C-alpha cells in the first residue's frame, strides 16, 4: 500500500551488493583475467539463472533450421573441437529456451564490478587497458546492469557483449595490450589486437553496423541470435555507462526547463511529474523529480526493478495498492509541496486512466514516458490488461496476439494522455519512440487535421506532442552543452569530491567570462550546472564506479579535462580519470525522433555527423571510440557514437583530450549551425573567434518571398 506522508518508506542510498546465497565473492586473484577461455570446461551451467537478479525476456528470433545450425556453429568457434559435442547440446538448449546463446557455463564466479584501478593495473600492461577493463566490468556489475547474466546493461536489450566467451577473450586481450596495439571489437566479438602506435586509439568498437537495407527489427533478431551482431544501445556497448546517474542530470535539466517553458516557474514545489520506467535509464526519473523539488510518480510493472531502485534510494516510496490509491497519495503530496518520488507498482496505462478520471483539480502538470518502446515487441513495453508475467508468456507463446495487445494498450495510453493534455497537462516524448510506435499502432498522436499516414510512407517526425529535444534539449545541444562525464579510476569517494570541486571552479570561470562577454545564454547554462555539481555529492548518485556527470560546452569540457589531468600528474588524485560522455549529445547521435529532431533542413535522417564524429575522435587520439546502430529510439532508427579517454597525468593525454574534445563538440555545433539553428550559429561564431584555425561554412538565409516567387506557377 502507499504509506502515509508521515510514514514514508525512504531507504538510504547504498552502493553495497546484496547479501544472499547467490552473492559471488570479490575477485581476489586478478591474474585469472589473463587466462581467457579455459582449456578445460567449467562445471555445466555454472551460475545459471540466479533468481536474485532480473533476467532478459525470452527472445523469439524465428530462426530457420539452417539459421539454428549457423548460430551453433558460430558459438562453437570460440572453443577447442574436443569440447564441441558437450557444448553443442548445451548451447542448443540455450538457443531454444532463451532465444540466444549466452554461454552461462563460462560466466565468471567472481563479482564483476569497477574494482580500484591498481587491481587492474597489476595485471595489465598499460594504464589505458586497465581503465577499459574497469569500465567493462562496471557495465556488468549486478547493481548496475539491468540483466547482468545476459550481459544487458540497460534498455531491455542494450548489450555489452553477446556471450560470456567474448568477455573472457576481451579481458585476456586487455591484459596483454601494449601502447602500440589497437583492439578491434566487432559487435561484441574481440577480433584481435593489431599493431598500431601510441597515437592511435587503444580500442575501436562497432556495434550493429549493417548494410543499411538490412536494418529491420527482424534482421536484428536473427543476427543477434546467430551471434554476429548486438544492439549496444549507447553507453552499454561503448563501456561508458555510469548507472542511472548517467541520465539523472539530463532528466533534471529537462524537467527543470519544462517547468520554466510550460509552467513559467523555476520552483516545481507542489507540481507533479508522471512517467513510467525504472530501468537503467528511466530509473533516473524519480531522483530527478526530487532534485527539482517536484512530486515524481513513476510506474513500473517489473517489481524487481522497482524494489531495486527503492533499495538504492532512487525511489522514496513504493505504492503497490492500485492506481486509485496512488492518485490519492499524489493529491496529498501535491498539497504538502514537498519533494517526493513515488514508485507505482503497476501498468502506467492504468495510472494515466486513473488520473484522467480523478475528479476535481488537474493533478498532473508534466508527463512523459520512458518505457523501452525502441523494442516494443521484445519486452520493452508491457501491455495493459495483462500482468507482467502473463505479458511475457504471451510474447513467447503467441507473438501476433502480443503485438495486438501492445497496440491496443498504446491506443489506451495515448487516449488517457490526450484527456489530461486537454485539461492543461504538458506532455513530451522522451526519445524512446513512444510517439512513433503509438502512431504505428493507430493511436491519436498526429497533429489535428493531419491525414492518416499511407501504408509504406515515411514515418512522421511531427506529432501533436513534441520530443523533449524539439522543445527543450535541442537548443541546449545547439549551444554546445551536453552530458560530459568522468570516472575516478581509484574508486575513491575523496577523489570524486576533488573532481567535483575542479569542475565547479571551471564552471564559475566559464560563466564569469561568458557574462562579461554578454553571452548570457552560456552563463545561464553554466549556472544551472554549477548548482548541480555543488549539490551532486549530497544526492547519493553513485551506483557502481565513482562517476559524475554534468552538462558543459567545448570550453568547459576542455578546461575540466586539463585541470583533472594536472591533478593526476601532481598526485592530487590517486589514479587516472576516464572522461567520456553520453552518446546523446551535441555531436554524437543522428536520430530524427530524438537528438536531431530539431534539425529542420531535411538532414534529420542523415548520419554524417555521428560517423564523422567517431572518425574525428579517433584521429585526434581518444583512448577508445565506438559507433553504433540504434540507441534510444531503436535499431535502424539511430546512428550514434561515443568515446572514452584516459587522463593519466601525461602531457600527451592532456594534448589528445584538448584536441579531441574541441572536435567532439564543434562538429555538432557546426552541423546544427548549417541547419540554421540560432543557438548553434551563436556558438559557432564564438568558437571561430576563440580558435583562429577553425573555419566554418556559414549559411545565408533565403527570403521566403524570394522562394515563393521562384516557385510560383
Can you say where each PLM-predicted feature lies in the sequence?
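N-terminal ligand-binding/catalytic initiation module
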Residues: 2-250, 256, 260, 264-266, ...
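Core active-site phosphate/anionic-ligand binding loop and the adjoining beta-turn-alpha structural block
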Residues: 324-560
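Short, solvent-exposed amphipathic alpha-helical segments in soluble enzyme
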Residues: 290-292, 357-362, 443-447, 568-569, ...
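General beta-strand structural signal in soluble alpha/beta enzymes
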Residues: 182-187, 205, 275, 298-299, ...
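Catalytic or ion-translocation cores adjacent to nucleophile or general acid/base/metal-coordination motifs
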Residues: 233-239, 243-253, 260, 267-272, ...
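Short, charged/polar "capping" segments at the starts of alpha-helices
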Residues: 305-308, 437, 587
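Catalytic cofactor-binding cores of redox enzymes
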Residues: 130-131, 137-149, 191, 221-234, ...
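C-terminal domain-closing interface element
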Residues: 332-338, 344-357, 680-712
Amino acid at each position: 500500500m502507499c504509506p502515509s506522508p508521515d510514514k514514508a518508506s525512504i531507504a538510504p542510498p547504498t552502493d553495497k551488493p546484496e547479501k544472499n546465497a547467490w552473492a559471488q565473492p570479490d575477485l581476489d586473484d586478478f591474474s585469472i583475467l589473463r587466462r581467457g577461455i579455459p582449456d578445460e570446461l567449467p562445471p555445466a551451467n555454472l551460475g545459471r539463472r540466479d533468481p536474485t537478479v532480473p533476467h532478459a525476456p525470452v527472445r523469439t528470433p524465428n530462426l530457420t533450421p539452417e539459421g539454428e545450425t549457423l548460430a551453433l556453429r558460430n558459438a562453437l568457434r570460440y572453443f577447442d573441437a574436443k569440447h564441441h559435442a558437450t557444448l553443442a547440446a548445451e548451447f542448443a538448449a540455450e538457443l531454444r529456451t532463451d532465444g540466444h546463446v549466452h554461454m552461462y557455463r563460462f560466466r565468471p564466479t567472481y563479482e564483476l564490478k569497477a574494482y580500484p584501478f591498481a587491481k587492474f593495473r597489476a595485471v595489465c600492461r598499460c594504464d589505458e587497458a586497465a581503465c577499459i577493463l574497469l569500465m567493462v566490468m562496471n557495465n556488468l556489475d549486478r547493481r548496475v546492469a539491468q540483466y547482468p547474466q545476459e550481459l544487458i546493461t540497460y534498455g531491455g536489450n542494450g548489450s555489452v557483449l553477446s556471450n560470456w566467451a567474448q568477455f573472457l577473450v576481451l579481458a585476456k586481450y586487455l591484459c596483454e595490450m601494449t601502447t602500440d596495439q589497437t583492439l578491434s571489437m566487432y559487435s561484441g566479438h574481440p577480433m584481435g589486437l593489431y599493431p598500431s602506435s601510441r597515437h592511435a586509439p587503444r580500442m575501436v568498437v562497432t556495434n550493429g553496423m549493417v548494410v543499411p537495407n538490412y536494418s529491420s527489427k527482424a534482421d536484428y533478431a536473427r543476427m543477434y541470435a546467430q551471434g554476429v551482431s548486438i544492439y549496444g544501445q549507447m553507453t552499454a556497448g561503448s563501456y561508458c555507462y555510469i548507472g542511472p546517474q548517467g541520465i539523472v542530470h539530463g532528466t533534471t535539466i529537462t524537467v527543470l526547463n519544462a517547468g520554466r517553458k510550460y509552467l513559467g516557474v523555476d520552483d516545481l514545489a507542489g507540481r507533479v511529474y508522471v512517467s513510467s520506467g525504472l530501468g537503467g535509464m528511466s530509473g533516473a526519473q524519480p531522483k530527478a523529480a526530487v532534485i527539482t523539488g517536484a512530486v515524481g510518480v513513476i510506474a513500473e510493472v517489473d517489481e524487481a526493478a522497482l524494489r531495486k531502485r527503492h533499495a538504492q534510494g532512487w525511489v522514496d516510496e513504493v505504492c503497490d495498492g492500485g492506481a486509485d490509491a496512488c492518485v490519492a497519495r499524489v493529491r496529498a503530496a501535491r498539497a504538502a509541496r514537498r519533494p517526493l518520488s513515488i514508485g507505482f507498482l503497476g501498468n502506467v496505462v492504468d495510472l494515466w486512466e486513473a488520473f484522467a478520471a480523478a475528479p476535481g483539480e488537474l493533478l498532473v502538470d508534466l508527463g512523459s514516458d520512458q518505457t523501452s518502446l525502441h523494442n516494443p515487441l521484445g519486452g520493452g513495453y508491457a501491455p495493459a490488461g495483462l500482468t507482467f508475467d502473463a505479458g511475457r508468456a504471451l510474447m513467447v507463446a503467441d507473438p501476433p496476439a502480443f503485438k495486438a495487445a501492445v497496440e491496443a494498450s498504446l491506443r489506451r495510453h495515448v487516449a488517457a494522455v490526450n484527456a489530461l493534455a486537454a485539461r492543461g497537462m504538458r506532455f513530451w516524448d522522451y526519445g524512446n519512440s513512444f510517439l512513433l510506435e503509438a502512431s504505428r499502432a493507430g493511436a491519436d498522436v498526429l497533429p489535428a487535421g493531419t491525414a492518416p499516414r499511407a501504408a509504406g510512407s515515411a514515418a512522421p517526425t511531427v506529432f501533436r506532442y513534441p520530443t523533449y529535444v524539439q522543445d527543450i534539449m535541442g537548443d541546449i545541444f545547439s549551444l554546445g552543452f551536453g552530458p560530459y562525464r568522468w570516472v575516478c579510476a581509484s574508486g575513491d569517494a575523496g577523489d570524486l569530491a576533488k573532481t567535483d570541486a575542479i569542475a565547479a571552479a571551471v564552471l564559475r570561470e566559464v560563466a564569469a567570462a561568458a557574462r562579461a562577454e554578454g553571452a548570457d545564454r552560456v552563463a545561464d547554462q553554466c549556472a544551472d550546472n554549477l548548482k548541480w555539481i555543488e549539490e551532486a555529492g549530497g544526492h547519493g548518485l553513485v551506483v557502481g564506479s565513482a562517476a559524475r556527470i554534468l552538462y558543459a560546452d567545448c570550453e568547459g569540457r576542455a578546461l575540466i579535462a586539463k585541470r583533472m589531468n594536472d591533478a593526476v600528474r601532481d598526485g592530487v588524485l590517486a589514479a587516472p580519470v576516464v572522461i567520456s560522455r553520453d552518446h546523446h549529445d551535441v555531436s554524437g547521435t543522428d536520430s530524427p525522433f530524438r537528438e536531431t529532431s530539431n534539425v529542420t533542413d531535411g538532414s534529420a535522417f542523415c548520419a554524417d555527423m555521428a560517423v564523422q564524429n567517431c572518425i574525428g575522435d579517433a584521429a585526434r587520439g581518444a583512448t577508445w571510440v565506438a559507433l553504433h546502430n540504434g540507441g534510444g529510439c531503436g535499431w535502424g532508427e539511430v546512428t550514434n557514437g561515443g568515446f572514452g579517454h584516459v587522463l593519466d597525468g601525461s602531457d600527451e593525454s592532456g594534448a589528445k583530450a584538448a584536441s579531441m574534445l574541441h572536435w567532439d563538440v564543434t562538429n555538432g555545433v557546426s552541423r546544427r549551425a548549417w541547419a540554421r539553428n540560432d543557438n548553434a550559429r551563436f556558438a559557432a561564431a564564438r568558437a571561430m573567434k576563440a580558435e583562429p584555425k577553425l573555419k566554418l561554412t556559414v549559411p545565408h538565409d533565403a527570403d521566403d518571398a524570394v522562394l515563393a516567387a521562384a516557385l510560383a506557377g
